[in-house]
Amino acid sequence: MSRLEQRFAQLKTEGRAALVTFITAGDPGYDTSLQVLKGLPAAGADVIELGMPFTDPMADGVAIQLATLRALDAGQTLQKTLQMVSEFRVDDQTTPIVLMGYYNPIHRFGVEAFVAQAKEAGVDGLIIVDLPPEHDAELATPAQASGIDFIRLTTPTTDDARLPRVLERSSGFVYYVSVAGVTGAGSATTEHVTEAIARLRRHTSLPISVGFGIRTPEQAAAIARLADGVVVGSAFVDKIATAESPEKAIDGVLTLCAALAEGVRNARIG
């Protein structure tokens, strides 16, 4: 059983959803980013998505685009992102880490080398936003063969004809993008999310995590009552962007994480 499977199974027995947190690797610099990464589990993160900086992040909103630029300007590379996971794993062998990003940097790195090094570093899953299931042979197949889950994105515009194809080779969990558009957009209504989750459950038994537009403990709690996971990204990135110092960036992210975790953990009580 993979770390992702173990974590979602554990949370199911506890009767609560997972808090899935996203940060961009290397934002605003390697050392600060690593400290944030290491601090997230104690602050309540159940699963961590780590963004792989890329020069053309087309699916991301302004906040994450700027985070990517900060990371690249600070010298972040795919090799350093894998190194960051390795350093995290020295002290934490249980929290799942999912790398999220685009295929181009992996293709340039070399798929075989990337999969081998990602596995060795302790990466548990991949979300590649611009690689559809028609291209499974390029990365999904070798990744899953090495024990790395391949997580698919579904959206409000993924129709019933397309959905089975998208979900067919998914593993780890399903990431439902609740608002069509770029990251950081407005949040969907609970009615919409309820209907979407019911539709997804007709096609998959995998845990379903919902993201895009979730910023507050109240919003996180509302989604945690419906989904298996709550994904928060832009809100953390904004904390880093507006911090006056690296120390305040770390504190801002971890304080927000603790508040969101409390919302998620208490969502189904009462």
UniProtKB/Swiss-Prot annotation:
Stored Gene3D superfamilies: Aldolase class I
Domain of life of the source: Bacteria
GO cellular component: cytosol
UniProt pathway annotation: Amino-acid biosynthesis; L-tryptophan biosynthesis; L-tryptophan from chorismate: step 5/5
Keywords for the protein's UniProt record, in alphabetical order: Amino-acid biosynthesis, Aromatic amino acid biosynthesis, Lyase, Tryptophan biosynthesis
Coiled coil, from the record: none
UniProt-listed InterPro entries: Aldolase_TIM, RibuloseP-bd_barrel, Trp_synthase_alpha_AS, Trp_synthase_suA
The protein's Enzyme Commission number: 4.2.1.20
MF GO annotations: tryptophan synthase activity
Active site as annotated: E49 (proton acceptor), D60 (proton acceptor)
One Pfam family, short name: Trp_syntA
Catalytic activity: (1S,2R)-1-C-(indol-3-yl)glycerol 3-phosphate + L-serine = D-glyceraldehyde 3-phosphate + L-tryptophan + H2O
PANTHER family for the chain: TRYPTOPHAN SYNTHASE ALPHA CHAIN, CHLOROPLASTIC, TRYPTOPHAN SYNTHASE, ALPHA CHAIN
HAMAP family membership: Trp_synth_alpha (MF_00131)
Complex formation: Tetramer of two alpha and two beta chains.
Summary of the function given for this chain in its UniProt record: The alpha subunit is responsible for the aldol cleavage of indoleglycerol phosphate to indole and glyceraldehyde 3-phosphate.
Protein family per UniProt: Belongs to the TrpA family.
Protein name per Swiss-Prot or TrEMBL: Tryptophan synthase alpha chain
Originating organism: Pseudomonas savastanoi pv. phaseolicola (strain 1448A / Race 6)
Chain's gene name: trpA
